[in-house]
Amino acid sequence: AKLQELSEMAEKVQKDMANLAAIEKNVRTQMDKYGIALKEEAKPENSLRGIGGPSSVEISETTVLMEQNKNLHQQLQHKTEDWNKLLTKLKKENYRKEMTPNLWPCNSQYVTSEFGGRYNPFDGYSSDWHGGLDIADSYGAPVYATASGYVEYSGWYYGYGKYIRINHDYGYKTAYAHMAELYVSSGDYVTKGEVIGEIGSTGYSTGPHLHYEVLLWGQEINPRDLM
């Protein structure tokens, strides 16, 4: 009976080890995907204490081996819990990264108007508040979603012309204006880096460019602060 119990315990240990290996692989896959380097102190302990035992099983040694296997089973369960906690933490961190608008929204880096106060581009002398970045680019060039989220609005929006607004998590929203073509519709889910439209000059615009805005809890912020 004790030999049968020992065999069952050994089988549990094998299953624990297989489960642990799968979780650890998942953690490392998440780390590689997002380029995360795991600090040494954050890693679950790699060594498993109390592993070992006689090479041949005799009846008099069965109790000792069963105790060793029980200890190993408990250690593997604790380590699995640690890796699961780490995996949950990584997923939360990765989700936050996906929802943070820190990508550049188009191929061109040529900013013609920065965030903040400026002269009105239509009359050249009156003061004007500019709540985003104006980035000049070729007509028809791609526009990218700078973070993942749901398209809150896609269509014509007053002086912004063809316009997209995306609602991300953590209070972030992004807006893309004066576009020539819109590839996504209201209610669509877009992923970070996805092409959502083309550079244009619709609405109140002096030439092909992208007007790009970032809002945090409804307040316009400088997009450069996140890049």
Task: Name what the model sees in each region.
Residues 1-110, 114:
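Non-catalytic extracellular/periplasmic "stalk"
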Residues 103-227:
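Catalytic cores of peptidoglycan-degrading enzymes
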